[in-house]
UniProtKB/Swiss-Prot annotation:
This is Zinc finger protein 675. Interacts with TRAF6. CDD domains: KRAB_A-box. The keyword Transcription applies. It comes from the Eukaryota. The gene is ZNF675. Keywords: DNA-binding, Metal-binding, Nucleus, Repeat, Transcription, Transcription regulation, Zinc, Zinc-finger. One of its GO terms (biological process) is bone resorption. It comes from Homo sapiens.
Length: 568
């Protein structure tokens, strides 16, 4: 198909035809010619300024121009054509007059305008004027006009589509900018602009989306914002669609039941995945380290360890995580939120897994059993720790001092010795700790509560670990023995500290003078030398000391213990 030319869109009249038009019709003609010309120029189509254009711009009468060839067969034209598109009676009459004269001059005496009683009866109307479009000469085929604004089309379908633009009702609205359209196709085309631009960009991960609403949803990954709550179980979701899908679980039939534990599922694939828990099968293996998993999602999460990807960052302390759920749990350290409460004793936890394990205390159940020695535990974490007694495996090593640990959590806590980080702060007195357990124990000082009581002697303790240690006094148990010298200890921490005598290890270093110590308590006391603080005060004479050992020695002056020794 050749390029569009000005001749293709021009409407031409003979001199006689031109004289039949009144002033309004001639002005309309001029406007249409000029508009067509400007449209072609705008589209970049080369158009020479013909005499016709020049005359029109100067508002002169146009010269006689050649008319197009007429069709050989005389067409039949519906009179509703003129009535619909040229509603004004004088324009309709002129149209019919000019059309008939043109065909008569070409020798087509049989040309007639067919009269129809209604548009509905007219086959030409019903056919969308397809036949009319094909048989009309150039002049008539360009005469489909929009009566809202002066615009001429060469097909009825184009005119009809154009008229919709002037409809006041525009039901198709853009969610992004609020703009309305009368046709769905126009809205679809408009929305593609957003897809191309991708103007909504996430500041966290630089992901681009084509709608601001999508960006808002995406950001909830980082904020862990969960707006949609299930009325049945109080579970929350960050997208309404997720809540809707979750609600279906209540309504859905669950025909697939696990024969092992009785749990039911609404999909056979879910049951298949669940069964892996009982079989111990781990089909999803990490190519990097060989570790296997029973779920593909767990493997995906694990892979982030190797890539180092940690997209979920805590705004409070800057700590990063590989999973959004881990960040949600971590945030509870700062907020103190403990949503999981034991109905038996009222104790609350920040994790559902902790509550589940805690319940075993009340039931006496110990489901976690060591395959090596048969010892059972009420917590899986206790079993994991116990197993390392048999293996002596310590895979987590500190890069700072080389110390190795059985658990990653222990390494994390240990690192705070070097960094000095103390994220757990007491709201009562402002004292900070590097472990949450230490803060929990410390809080009991303010309440004065000592819930852990010795059945043997009645002595009460703030911490359960202190009671456990105390009981060894009555039992005489000293389970922790040094392999180097054979000395035994009641506590594992005492053995650890003792071992440093043999190794010479001094992990606690003073930043002020560089002096190192084997115990953190010694470093704490040493720091007082630099500050000049003397926190240890004698109750008898108000004399103060910078070390507790010096106060202990001083007290002997008042008790007479030192004098007695001198007399000997």
């Amino acid at each position: 198909m050749g390029l569009l030319t000005f001749r293709d869109v021009a409407i031409e009249f003979s001199l006689e035809e031109w004289q039949c038009l009144d002033t309004a019709q001639r002005n309309l003609y001029k406007n249409v010619i000029l508009e067509n010309y400007r449209n072609l120029v705008f589209l970049g189509i080369a158009v020479s300024k013909q005499d016709l254009i020049t005359c029109l711009e100067q508002e002169k009468e146009p010269l006689t121009v050649k008319r197009h060839e007429m069709v050989n067969e005389p067409p039949v034209m519906c009179s509703h054509f003129a009535q619909e598109f040229w509603p004004e009676q004088n324009i309709k009459d002129s149209f019919e007059k000019v059309t008939l004269r043109r065909y008569e001059k070409c020798g087509n005496d049989n040309f007639q305008l067919k009269g129809c009683k209604s548009v509905d009866e007219c086959k030409l109307h019903k056919g969308g004027y397809n036949g009319l479009n094909q048989c009309l000469p150039t002049m008539q085929s360009k005469m489909f006009q929009c009566d809202k604004y002066v615009k001429v089309f060469n097909k009825f379908s184009h005119s009809d589509r154009h008229k919709i633009k002037h409809m006041e009702n525009k039901p198709f609205k853009c969610k992004e900018c609020g703009r309305s359209f009368c046709m769905l196709s126009h809205l679809t085309r408009h929305e593609r602009n957003y897809t191309k631009v991708n103007f909504c960009k996430c500041e966290e991960c630089e992901k681009a989306v084509n709608q601001s609403s999508k960006l808002t949803k995406h950001k909830r990954i980082y904020t862990c914002e969960k707006l949609y709550k299930c009325q049945e179980c109080d579970r929350t979701f960050n997208q309404f669609s997720n809540l809707t899908e979750y609600k279906k679980d209540y309504a859905r039939e669950k025909p697939y039941k696990c024969e092992e534990c009785g749990k039911a599922f609404n999909q056979s694939s879910h049951l298949t995945t669940h069964k892996i828990i009982h079989t111990g099968e781990k089909p999803y293996k990490c190519e990097e380290c060989g570790k296997a998993f029973n779920q593909f999602s767990n493997l995906t999460t694990h892979k982030k360890i190797h890539t180092g990807e940690q997209p979920y960052i805590c705004e409070e302390c800057g700590k990063a995580f590989t999973q959004s759920s881990t960040l949600t749990t971590h945030k509870r350290i700062h907020t103190g939120e403990k949503p999981y409460k034991c109905e038996e004793c009222g104790k609350a936890f920040n994790r559902s897994s902790k509550l589940t394990e805690h319940k075993n205390i009340h039931t006496g159940e110990q489901p976690y059993k060591c395959e090596e020695c048969g010892k059972a535990f009420n917590r899986s974490s206790n079993l994991t720790e116990h197993r390392k007694i048999h293996t002596e495996e310590k895979p987590y090593k500190c890069k700072e001092c080389g110390k190795a640990f059985k658990h990653s959590s222990a390494l994390t806590t240990h690192k705070r010795i070097h960094t000095g980080e103390k994220p757990y702060k007491c709201e009562e007195c402002g004292k900070a700790f590097n472990r949450s357990s230490k803060l929990t124990e410390h809080k009991k000082l303010h309440t004065g509560k000592k819930p852990y009581k010795c059945e043997e002697c009645g002595k009460a303790f703030i911490q359960s670990s202190k009671l456990t240690e105390h009981k060894k006094i009555h039992s005489g148990e000293i389970p922790y023995k040094c392999e180097e010298c054979g000395k035994a200890f009641k506590h594992s921490s005492s053995l650890t500290t003792h071992k440093r005598i043999h190794t010479g290890e001094k992990p606690y270093k003073c930043e002020e003078c560089g002096k190192a110590f084997s115990r953190s308590s010694k470093l704490t006391e040493h720091k007082i030398i630099h500050t000049g603080e003397k926190p240890y005060k004698c109750e008898r004479c108000d004399k103060a000391f910078n070390q507790s050992a010096n106060l202990t020695k001083h007290k002997k002056i008042h008790t007479g213990e030192k004098l007695q020794n001198w007399n000997v």
